[in-house]
Amino acid sequence: MTDYELMGAALEEAARAAALGEVPVGAVVARNGEIIAAAHNTRETEKNALHHAELLAIDAACKKLGGWRLWQCELLVTLEPCPMCSGGIINSRIRRVVYGAADTKAGCCGSVTDLFALPFNHHPVVESGLRAEEAQALLQAFFLRLREQRAAKPRWKPPVTP
């Protein structure tokens, strides 16, 4: 599979996350163009702050390949990795990261900071912007829907005392 097709699989995972009420982020770990593992965010449904798509995909790939060193693998993810996920990428030795949309709030591949430029023992190649418009559209639609749901929900107001 090409990077474009692999990112398509990540976008499908992101759509699954959105359908569950999760922030729509999807990731795939691939080796030689073949998907080894795919995942999407499950932080809300699993009530676990660590359940980002990237970490879940890395975990599944490690289990499938029988080791923690994924130096022959690439990670394609719909949103620029956060600090936690960037740490997982470094520790698992992913050789290349391709992401779609930039994350101006928590992105660690250059948007907020670049963890991969720091003197760690591993530095993956990073490519950005692949199918970014599609990834951004999923995120924007999700957060618009979330804002609309919150606006429609009555808010508690304290009783007025005379």
Model-predicted regions and their roles:
Residues 43, 77, 101:
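Residues that line or immediately flank small-molecule/substrate-binding pockets and catalytic motifs
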Residues 67-80:
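Immediate flanking context of iron-sulfur cluster ligation sites
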Residues 10, 14-17, 27, 37, ...:
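Small-residue (primarily alanine) positions within well-ordered alpha-helices
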